[in-house]
From Swiss-Prot:
Acetyl-CoA binds at A376, N382, Y383, A419, R436. Signal peptide: none annotated. This is Bifunctional protein GlmU. The active site is at H359. Residues 227-247 are annotated as: Linker. Its EC number is 2.7.7.23, 2.3.1.157. Pfam families: Hexapep, NTP_transf_3. InterPro entries: Bifunctional_GlmU, GlmU-like, GlmU_C_LbH, Hexapep, MobA-like_NTP_Trfase, Nucleotide-diphossugar_trans, Trimer_LpxA-like_sf. It is found in: Cytoplasm. Homotrimer.
Amino acid sequence: MLAVAVLAAGKGTRMKSALPKVLQPLAGATLVERVLASAKNLQPERRLLIVGHQAERVEQTLEHVNGLEFVLQSPQNGTGHAVQQLLPVMEGFEGELLVLNGDVPLLRAATIDALVQGHRSSGADVTLLTARLADPTGYGRVFADTDGQVSNIIEHRDCSEEQRGNNLTNAGIYCFNWAALAEVLPQLSNDNDQGELYLTDTVAMLPRAMHLEVDDPDEVNGINNRKQLAQCEGVLQQRLRDYWMDEGVTFVDPASCTLSEDCRFGRDVVVEPQTHFRGCCSIGDNSKLGPGTLIDNASLGDRVEVVQSVVREAKVGDDVSIGPFAHLRPAADVGHGCRIGNFVEVKKSSLGAGSKVNHLSYIGDASLGENVNVGAGTITANYDGVNKHQTVIGDHSKTGANSVLVAPVTIGDHVTIGAGSTITKDVPSKALSIGRARQMTKDNWANRSI
């Protein structure tokens, strides 16, 4: 059996944030959510989150995670003290305990799996993850033989000059035999500079300790401040971009674009500079996005082009052109072959196949049929000050420039709305509707004061 415990009780003072450190966002998910996800493939029998600082807020944020047990550490008195809190709740448990840190979000699932499998095959009481760092300053040094058996872990401040030449460091991630760990946890001492109980001290107390060296040191980067958060964001973004480039996506300027792990791209997609993807996005084959574009929780079909625009919580069909400077807001549904032009906003509206809104328009709470042509400056006036109302425009209808459709109103099929009209009543199919003041011209007006 396997239990996974995530240490998430720390305050994160150096973040200088009202938000607990483990709830800081990284590529669309919190740090601790990423840590939990990294161990998901192991299918542990128990998952425990050790909480402390703002425990209630952390629990509320993660209440959607099925089967997650919360264990309170109060006060926060070190990593060893944190794991001591598991003693009563894991009484009678038989198996391994994997200990992860809630602020180390870049661990790959394959690395964690290798740690657990290596621990099981070695017969060790504890196996710890290690990394060789170019600059190990501040990290505890791990001393081990060529077979991987650990003899000692010495904190940086306690190392001699010779010992500091060893760049094999402790990543703070462990796989224990729970029964062996449970015996030594009560023996931990706080006789150290910080007056805390260190989980590291259990390694020397257990008969057999092994280590597994991680191939990529970036995996064990911890986050204590905003700079480190940004560095980890950069590593994760590069992983995502590399993956999708290997899958047939072109990033013209990769470093200027950001993704979420819930993005899905078809083949031969081209992403121009300064284009960003948030949340769950689906992009069809042969689409071209950007530059200067945001796609947020949206679904785009094949051969879609979006230029310098925002598409948020919207659905876009095949062969659609959007932008520049268009804004598709939540519940916009744009059909096959549509055109959304410059300075157009669409909200909670559907556009049938082939419809066009080319310039300077607001389409809100509306249903447009197929092959509708919306003239420049057309507005659906959907709000009466209290409630929103719907505008319906039938197939093959067109509105003249600078028209206002005052909802609720229904425009039939094959209707023409004259330019400059304000339409307040329904218009039957095949009609021409003009609702504007009659033009009046007064000759010699300029001479009136002479």
